[in-house]
């Protein structure tokens, strides 16, 4: 059965999610019925069609004042309703029969916010950013998505950086046993920075994004602890923004219990990328630079040429990700997993009902 979703917030992630839906072929399984965004429809359609990072969308896009239209090669089109509602409790999710709201605003993230979408008629909510501790689950697809149940109505997809580093941490921990670690995120500039010097509550972010490498706060270590409780207080992280518009590199250093060599580490990463985490983690030894990972759908790409081992127990890795495109693809994967958990519960109920009838 087709999953009906609505996108709340049509910025970098919201637009990437919609484009990834069609480029991945998942539009055969997911139907976007509405987009809620305060911007003008003309600008929404234009930025969906043309993107400075991801190029031109391969599907023709048009609009009227109430809809986005996505054209198909066979002459048919998808009509997506445009909403301009700032109060999420007033959104018509009930009338539109929305299964899951993909909240890509970056603004909402509490249980109360999720319940507001549900009160408006949505069955479930998936936040595109780290959320409060009182939500039902935080999912890093490929690592813990199988923990989803039908009872998980308010879910977070974590962040682009947790989706990048957590699967790699799992691989290393499963193979060698991690004791502790540190992470430096080297992140492309974002739209919370200034084009030229201007006011911001974070004084470092008052400075022009194109002119400096800018340290920013990060709570990545908290996200790791949420997914792996055994690593609470075992990881620390720092982050810097650099003057590129997309793609992020992550410098991961971990101490492990087992004696290891570089070849051991790379073999473990390469093998898992070809089996259990295929499509989530990739491995390369090609001499690539950041632009080469633009529009890559993987959560993480390990650069095996940069793997280092010191004193047999300290591992250093360089891991790349397209912080927009990879994350947008995981939003779709997680939404489908949430939907599948409902289908599984329905099947189990039917099976129990048949057994009860047979035994009566």
From Swiss-Prot:
Paired cysteines (S-S): none
Entry keyword annotation includes RNA-binding: no
Function as written in the Swiss-Prot or TrEMBL entry: Catalyzes the NAD-dependent conversion of D-erythrose 4-phosphate to 4-phosphoerythronate.
UniProt key word NAD: yes
UniProt keywords, alphabetically: Cytoplasm, NAD, Oxidoreductase, Pyridoxine biosynthesis
EC top class, as a word: oxidoreductase
BP GO terms, sorted: pyridoxal phosphate biosynthetic process; pyridoxine biosynthetic process
Highest taxon of the lineage: Bacteria
Subunit (UniProt): Homotetramer.
Pfam families registered for this protein in UniProt: Gp_dh_C, Gp_dh_N
Any one GO cellular component localisation term in the record: cytoplasm
Localization (cell): Cytoplasm
Gene Ontology molecular function: erythrose-4-phosphate dehydrogenase activity; NAD binding
Gene behind the chain: epd
Organism: Photobacterium profundum (strain SS9)
Binding sites annotated in the UniProt record for NAD(+): 12-13, 323
Binding-site positions, substrate: 159-161, 205, 218-219, 241
Family: Belongs to the glyceraldehyde-3-phosphate dehydrogenase family. Epd subfamily.
Site, as annotated: Activates thiol group during catalysis: 187
InterPro entries to which the protein is assigned, alphabetical: E4P_DH_bac (IPR006422), GlycerAld/Erythrose_P_DH (IPR020831), GlycerAld_3-P_DH_cat (IPR020829), GlycerAld_3-P_DH_NAD(P)-bd (IPR020828), NAD(P)-bd_dom_sf (IPR036291)
Stored CDD domains: GAPDH_N_E4PDH
Residue numbers annotated as active site: 160 (nucleophile)
Catalytic activity, EC: 1.2.1.72
Catalysed reactions, as listed in the record: D-erythrose 4-phosphate + NAD(+) + H2O = 4-phospho-D-erythronate + NADH + 2 H(+)
HAMAP family reported in the protein's UniProt record: E4P_dehydrog (MF_01640)
Pathways per UniProt: Cofactor biosynthesis; pyridoxine 5'-phosphate biosynthesis; pyridoxine 5'-phosphate from D-erythrose 4-phosphate: step 1/5
SUPFAM superfamilies from the UniProt entry: Glyceraldehyde-3-phosphate dehydrogenase-like, C-terminal domain, NAD(P)-binding Rossmann-fold domains
Annotated protein name in UniProt: D-erythrose-4-phosphate dehydrogenase
């Amino acid at each position: 059965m087709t999953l009906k979703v609505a996108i709340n917030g049509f910025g970098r992630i919201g637009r990437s999610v919609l484009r990834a839906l069609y480029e991945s072929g998942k539009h055969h399984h997911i139907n976007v019925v509405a987009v809620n965004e305060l911007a003008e429809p003309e600008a929404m359609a234009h930025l969906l069609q043309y993107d400075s990072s991801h190029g031109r969308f391969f599907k023709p896009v048009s609009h009227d004042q109430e809809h986005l239209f996505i054209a198909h090669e066979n002459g048919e089109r998808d009509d997506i309703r445009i909403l301009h509602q700032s109060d999420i409790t007033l959104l018509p999710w009930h009338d539109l029969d929305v299964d899951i709201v993909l909240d890509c605003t970056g603004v909402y993230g509490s249980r109360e916010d999720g319940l507001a979408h549900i009160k408006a008629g949505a069955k479930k909510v998936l936040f595109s950013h780290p959320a409060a501790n009182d939500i039902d689950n935080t999912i890093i697809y490929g690592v813990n998505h199988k923990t989803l149940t039908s009872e998980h109505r308010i879910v977070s997809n974590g962040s682009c950086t947790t989706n990048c580093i957590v699967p790699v941490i799992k691989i290393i921990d499963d193979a060698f046993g991690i004791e502790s670690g540190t992470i430096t995120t080297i992140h492309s500039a974002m739209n919370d920075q200034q084009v030229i010097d201007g006011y911001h509550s974070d004084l470092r972010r008052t400075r022009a994004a194109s002119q400096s490498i800018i340290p920013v706060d990060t709570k990545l270590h908290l996200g790791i602890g949420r997914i792996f409780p055994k690593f609470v207080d075992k990881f620390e992280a720092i982050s810097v923004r650099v003057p590129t518009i997309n793609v992020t590199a992550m410098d991961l250093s971990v101490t492990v219990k087992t004696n290891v060599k570089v070849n051991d580490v790379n073999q473990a990463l390469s093998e898992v990328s070809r089996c259990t985490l295929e499509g989530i983690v990739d491995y390369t030894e090609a001499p690539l630079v950041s632009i080469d990972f633009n529009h890559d759908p993987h959560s993480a790409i390990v650069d095996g040429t940069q793997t280092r081992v010191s004193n047999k127990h300290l591992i250093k890795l360089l891991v790349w990700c397209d912080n927009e495109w990879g994350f947008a693809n995981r939003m779709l994967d997680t939404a489908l997993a949430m939907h599948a958990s409902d289908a599984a519960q329905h099947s189990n109920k039917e099976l129990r009902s048949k057994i009860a009838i047979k035994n009566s």
